[in-house]
UniProtKB/Swiss-Prot annotation:
It comes from Leuconostoc citreum (strain KM20). GTP binds at residues 30-37, 57-61, 75-78, 142-145, 175-177. One of its GO terms (cellular component) is cytosol. Necessary for normal cell division and for the maintenance of normal septation. GO terms for molecular function: GTP binding; metal ion binding. This is Probable GTP-binding protein EngB. InterPro entries: G_ENGB_dom, GTP-bd, GTP-bd_ribosome_bio_YsxC, P-loop_NTPase, Small_GTP-bd. PROSITE patterns: G_ENGB (PS51706).
Length: 194
């Protein structure tokens, strides 16, 4: 998709605040600092549109980005960050669960994992949960520029094994915000799910 017009239209914490115009939505989930904002910036070809931070746990709301007046990217708070309170983690969990299980406009979820590491318990739980609710999933292995392309198969097989990956219901791609590797493939998946 050729992207010229993007606008962050709102930050929401409950269904009453979600957009009401019926556009399709693609949510981005993953642990804190896995690269959700960097993926968004790369997809829309803007350097600092979605705020990136070296400080984990920065995103605390569902952030809706209107892309070309055709769809929304929904940046979901990162999970697995230990320095937020248990009460705050529960609130994030409830907010995310409400959104993902009840939002009719949600067409799919891009679940980000770090290509260099085994998926965390939270990554596995999120994948299983999305799969349980029959939500189309694209697993994106970020930071792939940090590993040799000759080792992609090894890393892909390991990530899929750890997640219990179901290829009949999910897709998998490597991605790098540094080199833009995988950008077009992610867009193809998004377009197919609009």
């Amino acid at each position: 998709m050729n992207v010229n017009n993007v606008e962050m239209v709102m930050s929401a914490v409950s269904a009453a605040q979600y957009p009401t115009d019926g556009k399709p939505e693609i949510a981005l989930v993953g642990r804190s600092n896995v690269g959700k904002s960097s993926l968004t910036n790369t997809l829309i070809q803007r350097k600092n549109f979605a705020r990136t931070s070296s400080q984990p746990g920065k995103t605390q709301t569902l952030n809706f980005y209107d892309v070309e007046n055709q769809l929304y990217f929904v940046d979901v708070p990162g999970y697995g960050y230990a320095k937020v309170s248990k009460k705050q983690r529960e609130a994030f969990g409830n907010m995310i669960e409400e959104y993902i299980t009840s939002r009719k406009q949600l067409r799919g979820v891009i679940s980000l994992v770090d290509a260099r590491h085994d998926p965390s318990e939270d990554d596995v739980a999120m994948y299983e949960w999305l799969h349980y609710y029959n939500i189309p999933i694209l697993v994106v292995a970020t930071k792939s520029d940090k590993i040799s392309k000759s080792k992609f198969n090894k890393y892909e097989n390991n990530i899929k094994k750890q997640l219990g990956f179901d290829s009949s219901a999910s897709d998998f791609l490597f991605f790098s915000s540094e080199t833009k590797y995988g950008r077009d493939s992610v867009w193809e998946w998004i377009t197919a799910h609009m």
